[in-house]
Amino acid sequence: PESYIEKVQYYPNLAEATLGIKAVVKGQGTLEAKAFYGGEPCGSVSAKSEGGTVTMTLPLSRLEKWEPGHGRLYDLTLTYGEDKVESYFGMREVRLDGEKFLINDKSVFQRLVLDQGFYPDGIYTAPTEEALVKDVELSMAAGFNGARLHQKVFEPLFLYHCDKAGYLVWGEQGCWGLDYSNPAALKYFLPEWMEALERDFNHPAIIGWCPFNETWDYEGRRQDDSLLANVYKMTKLYDTTRPCIDTSGNYHVVTDIYDLHNYEQDPAKFAATYESFKQGGDLEDNHGYRQTPVKGIPTFISEYGGIKWDEEGVGKDGWGYGAGPATKEEFLNRYKGLTDALLDNPHMFAFCYTQLYDVEQELNGLYTYERKPKFDMDVIKAINARKAAIED
């Protein structure tokens, strides 16, 4: 058609029980929006286009909040001339309050797991839609309420099932091998990153962005801090509704959230590292010569554990962090000790365990590559799911 909807963004407002709608359209016309919950109509609005855009506010007669574990979704029909779009949205807000990460104004401890989006047959391509659903279900069965979608822009279908499940995810971008010492490296990276932000903006499950991971110095050349700062600024300019971590683990330049990676395998040493921080002192950072922890903002250990357990007998070709435990009992004791140290810290708002399932040579998943459980997941869930010190 000559008149059509090119793209649209949704802005939930819980206090007003409204949905802000910003659309880019082609041709002249009137955009009409109708919302439904459980098949019942609960709001409508229309507005004429001006200069190729339409901005309007949709009032809702029924407010159902999208929350962790409860992916309450509204259906939305958008009509512009002959063009009709069937869409959906979730009513949820995120904001930072000191050291806390608030979802709908409630402090929520994020029990995250690293998910790299690998599959034995298709590698980066899931064999079926059911396989995408299963990964969310397996994670939640282990007591996690979300994931770092690690070094991969996941498919929209996966994100849809995260939306349905109320499963919290962090959007990332693959950056392995990027020359962080040269701003010219952004020539291809930045446009692709901005495309990911635009494509996935409306997913309520995405509660934050992280464009880079472990930005080490590149072949002896120092990281260019302006490279990270510029991508952070572009991310925040495009999306004012979500926090952004400039680079996960290191080396931080400007960030809304401070995170570190720590694969210490001794629970006592691991806990001792953060004891001062637990008591209100400084955060110990093993990259202290390159980055300084920011006090008073949300902080978490976004990679830890990575405990090797060779369930399939792969042997010497398999890999995990540190010395693997000799028994499953030893594994569970180590897992509990490491995780307890983070749950009990009133200045930590989240953790992210490495990782959900084995990936190729990496044998540090809680499930095998084929998604078979290595351990009693009820035990893992009990460790993960207990109340954290920072939680409401």
Model-identified regions with their sequence ranges:
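Substrate-binding/catalytic cleft of secreted carbohydrate-active enzymes
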Residues: 134-137, 146-371, 379
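Secreted/periplasmic carbohydrate-active enzymes, especially glycoside hydrolases
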Residues: 1-156, 161, 166, 192, ...
